Amino acid sequence: MRPSDGPGITVVGIAKEFESLVDCLYNCGDYDMQATIIETLLRYTTRSVRHKMASAWFPNYVKLQSLFLGIKDFESDCRTFLGHFNEGLSDKKQVWSYPMMFCTVEGRSLVKPEDLAEFWVDFNFGPGTVSFYYVFKVNNTTETICI
């Protein structure tokens, strides 16, 4: 996934829809939904629009704005951004993410995706799930287990 660099959508007229997405980012309580929202914001805005809107979307948190604007390698950079984002929510936090040393399901060891620095497990209080990504060795694709 690459952020949009083309003409994209202007801020005028669509800003409210993006604000609704950002509100959902703060309240959905689900890592996968949060990652999808970030991907949407990156795909449907130009770099210049993101620079203009980052301070409105993530007010009073310059590091978070910088992490958002610095997303290049989506999987790892988004994971870093959302880790800081969720930690910053303190008592309103609904997603807890922790690195795992290993994961075994029904006696089978699962393999960490190569594009992630660590093997993460997400506790999502919005939908009440636990999820993690792993590599499915049969076809070498990244899959998600959601409990």
Q: What spans do the regions from the language model cover?
A:
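Elongated alpha-helical scaffolds that mediate protein-protein interactions in large eukaryotic proteins
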Residues: 1-18, 34, 44-58
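Positions within ordered alpha-helical repeat solenoids
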Residues: 2, 23, 27, 43-47, ...
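Helix N-cap and loop-to-helix transition residues
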Residues: 3-4, 30, 146
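Alpha-helical solenoid scaffolds in eukaryotic proteins
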Residues: 15-24, 40, 59-65
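Short coil/turn segments at helix-helix junctions and helix-capping linkers
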Residues: 24-33, 69
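N-terminal recruitment modules of adaptor/scaffold proteins
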Residues: 65-147
